[in-house]
Curated annotation (Swiss-Prot):
It comes from the Viruses. This is Mucin-like protein Glc1.8b. Residues 489-515 are cytoplasmic. The gene is O16. Belongs to the polydnaviridae Glc1.8 protein family. It comes from Microplitis demolitor bracovirus (isolate Webb) (MdBV).
């Protein structure tokens, strides 16, 4: 009788160590008055599906489970935070939901306090085989694996915002956003001080033949079979989406302070801009199976038909689209800003990603090596078109196509009247091959600016001189004429006095002799 009582007491204590539902919380993340400030991980509506043949060794406890034998359960370690639960079992399909308060799925700021939200996996699916052994399963938060089965050991770094992750085939770029910074660089007044993990632009490239040894788990880990699906984790930021698939080419951008896209100083305060992901291209094969595709936050192709998965980026006006054949013209022009980094007096403080008139033309046969998605992108195969970047002037249109004809107005240094003049080449005309799509600015070519303040001044243009020379020549002619006249008059007087004129008694000439 005492043994039966003891067994009942042990079972009652075991059932009491379960995770209660969060108060006033809904599955769809709508605000129901719940204080999620200190909630780290709250899996809700968790379903445990285990086989009846599993023994005590193959099941484990949740909160602080210790399993040390070879029976193949998952060892979970209770993290340091009091509100974090780690759960593992042999076959589990968990849709863990812990939506932030007043937060929208598309990442628009709705005044949510995400201060202490560390990891929020949303709609996470755990699919493990019951035949997996202890070696093929691993733990998540601070996972400890010490046998020869070769799982990947994750160590939680000392810094609260630092995650150290290692695996055999993975290219991960870890993101740790600064305080009061959103994904698009606009200050949204959010205190992200205690956000621990923000991986941005993580690339998962796995083959269907990869084994458990070649896959690993990150903070909320959690693919453990050989099928090799890609696990998506919802980052702590409400407006950050991390996406990975079998073949992905992601370029992560990390802007320096006071720097433009090409690194020239434009007086811009980009202090808190950490990652600028622009024009990401996702290339997947149509032969990928369900295992090789995964679901993101708004996921959402899971069969083998290979549709295109679209992900809404954090910026409400920025779309990141991936498909096998993509031709995207992303437009998000900065105000008075130059793509080439010349200072145009523009405040680029909150401009995070400004792809301008970018054209992607790829062939369906291009491989992952032949595609890339840089900010100022560049051609890598022999069939692709030429991508042009927006030039410095705000009134200049840049068009990219395979054949590009640039007609630049040069220095003429002459006018129609053949008078020397200074003409500045301030207007550039880009003439594409497709005449139907080209619109030329006639005023900028036929009537170029003659006196631009940046290149010439009013003193540089020669004005017509006042006709002083004509007056001087006239004066000289008159002077010479007067001199000649006086000389000839003087020479004529002795000729007139050759005859002697007799004088009378009065001293006057007597003219009587002439009579």
């Amino acid at each position: 009788m005492s043994q039966i009582t003891l067994i009942i007491l042990v079972l009652a204590i075991g059932f009491s160590c379960t995770k209660s539902h969060p108060i006033n919380s809904t599955r769809d993340g709508e605000d129901s008055g719940t204080d999620l400030k200190n909630l780290l991980t709250e899996p809700a509506n968790t379903t445990y599906a285990t086989n009846s043949t599993l023994t005590r060794k193959e099941l484990n406890s949740t909160i602080q489970p210790e399993r040390n034998d070879e029976g193949s359960a998952i060892r979970k370690i209770m993290a340091s935070k009091k509100d974090e639960n780690i759960t593992g079992q042999s076959e589990i399909n968990t849709s863990a939901k812990s939506q932030p308060i007043n937060s929208t799925r598309d990442g628009e700021d709705s005044g949510t306090d995400l201060k202490n939200l560390l990891t929020e996996p949303a709609n996470t699916t755990y699919a493990t085989n019951s035949t997996l052994t202890r070696k093929e399963l691993n733990s998540s938060i601070p996972p400890e694996r010490n046998d020869e089965g070769s799982a990947i050991r994750k160590i939680m770094a000392s810094k609260k915002d630092e995650i150290i992750t290692g695996q055999s085939e993975i290219n991960t770029i870890a993101k740790s956003q600064p305080i009061n910074s959103t994904r698009d660089g606009e200050d949204s007044g959010t205190d992200l001080k205690n956000l621990l993990t923000e991986p941005a632009n993580t690339t998962y490239a796995t083959n269907s033949t990869l084994t458990r040894k070649e896959l690993n788990s990150s903070i909320p880990p959690e693919r453990n079979d050989e099928g090799s699906a890609i696990r998506k984790i919802m980052a702590s930021k409400k407006d950050e989406i991390i996406t990975g698939q079998s073949e992905i080419n992601t370029i992560a951008k990390s802007q320096p302070i006071n720097s433009t896209r090409d690194g020239e100083d434009s007086g811009t305060d980009l202090k808190n801009l950490l990652t600028e992901l622009a024009n990401t291209t996702y290339l997947t094969n149509s032969t990928l199976t369900r295992k090789e595709l995964n679901s993101t936050i708004q996921p959402e192709r899971n069969d083998e038909g290979s549709a295109i998965r679209k992900i809404m980026a954090s910026k409400k006006d920025e779309n990141i689209t991936g498909q096998s054949e993509i031709n995207t013209s992303a437009k998000s022009q900065p105000i008075n800003s130059t793509r080439d980094g010349e200072d145009s007096g523009t405040d680029l403080k909150n401009l995070l990603t400004d792809p301008a008139n970018t054209t992607y033309a790829t062939n369906s046969t291009l491989t992952r090596k032949e595609l890339n998605s840089t900010i100022q992108p560049e051609r890598n195969d022999e069939t692709s078109a030429i991508r042009k970047i927006m030039a410095s002037r705000k009134d200049e249109n840049v068009t990219g196509q395979s054949e590009f004809n640039i007609s630049t107005n040069s220095n003429l240094n002459t006018t129609t009247h053949h008078e020397d003049a200074v003409v500045s080449p301030t207007e550039k005309v880009y003439v594409p091959n497709n005449a139907s799509s080209a619109e030329l600015n006639v005023s900028s070519t036929i009537q170029p600016k003659e006196a631009d303040v940046t290149t010439s001044s009013a003193n540089d243009i020669k004005k017509p001189a006042f006709p002083y020379c004509i007056i001087l020549i006239t004066f000289q002619i008159v002077t010479v004429g007067m001199i000649i006249y006086l000389v000839f008059r003087t020479m004529r007087k002795p000729c007139q006095s050759e005859r002697a004129i007799p004088l009378n008694s009065f001293g006057f000439g007597n003219n009587s002799s002439y009579e």
